[in-house]
């Protein structure tokens, strides 16, 4: 009988109040029920605490804000053998969940991967290139955070996790994961909120993201890039230094 894997879903939250409640409701209805951990660095932690209390979700408070740090700390508290890192503004259905578990149950060589992104929804003008994007992502493309990256827990720690990076943590981890072993990009496609694109425009946002990735590839520090992206000057000055006393796990019952 093939092994049935367990899943821990880690959700980094930074002021995602609008989306968190509905996302937790959807995830709480998955079967078999995964372990769900919200790793929060919001300005108003009390709001997130109340949302997690409503859904009886484990809550992790991480200060100061850093997506890589939030993901790493969430992974440390997780108990399942598969880790799924999922954004609060991204959909995740039973079909996605079944696809994830089935992939590991049927192929013992898989170490991790992500889901295909529905780019037609975000970039309608690029519809003709969606087939190219699919092939590229499945074989050599970077696995971004909004694709719900997943990995065996043992492999995650062997690779050093997200290294606490405040930005480009997904790009960095994707490179390590693809270099290590068999990575699978799964269907069905997932959709994310258009909130970032609606504020700046689709093309401008895409160009901004591409420019940041180019700078990262050229060797610019992720902490400097985080300052540019978030407008938070403290990000570059921290240089990856976080207090070990900044993490608190709350089991909301």
PLM regions and their residue ranges:
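A recurrent flexible, glycine/aromatic-enriched loop bordering the glycosyltransferase active site
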Residues: 112-124, 133-151
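Hydrophobic helical membrane-anchoring modules
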Residues: 1-2, 175-253
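Short beta-strand/loop segment that forms part of the nucleotide-sugar
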Residues: 33-43, 60
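Short, well-formed alpha-helical segments that are part of the catalytic scaffolds
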Residues: 15-29
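A conserved acidic beta->alpha catalytic loop
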Residues: 40-48, 90
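Glycine-rich, basic loop-to-helix element that forms the pyrophosphate-binding segment
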Residues: 62-78
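Short aromatic/hydrophobic "clamp" motif used to bind/position activated sugar donors
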Residues: 83
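Conserved donor NDP-sugar-binding/catalytic core segment of glycosyltransferases
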Residues: 95-125
């Amino acid at each position: 009988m093939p092994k049935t894997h367990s899943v821990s879903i880690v959700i980094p939250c930074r002021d995602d109040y609008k989306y968190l409640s509905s996302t937790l409701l959807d995830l709480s209805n998955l079967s078999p029920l995964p372990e769900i951990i919200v790793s929060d660095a919001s300005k108003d932690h009390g709001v997130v605490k109340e949302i997690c209390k409503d859904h009886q979700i484990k809550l992790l408070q991480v200060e100061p804000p850093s997506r890589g740090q939030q993901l790493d700390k969430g992974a440390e508290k997780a108990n399942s053998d598969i880790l799924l890192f999922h954004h609060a503004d991204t959909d995740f259905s039973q079909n996605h969940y079944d696809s994830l578990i089935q992939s590991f149950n049927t192929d013992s060589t898989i170490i991790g991967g992500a889901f295909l992104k529905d780019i037609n929804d975000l970039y309608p003008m690029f519809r003709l290139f969606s087939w190219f994007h699919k092939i590229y992502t499945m074989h050599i493309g970077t696995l971004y955070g909004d694709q719900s990256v997943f990995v065996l827990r043992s492999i995650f720690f062997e690779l050093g996790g997200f290294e606490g990076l405040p930005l480009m943590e997904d790009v960095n981890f994707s490179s390590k994961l693809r270099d290590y072993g068999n990575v699978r990009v799964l269907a069905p496609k997932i959709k994310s909120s258009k909130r970032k694109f609606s504020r700046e425009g689709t093309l401008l946002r895409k160009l901004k993201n591409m420019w940041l990735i180019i700078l990262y590839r050229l060797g610019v520090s992720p902490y400097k890039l985080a300052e540019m992206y978030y407008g938070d000057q403290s990000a570059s000055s921290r240089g990856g230094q976080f207090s070990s006393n900044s993490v608190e796990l709350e089991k909301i019952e």
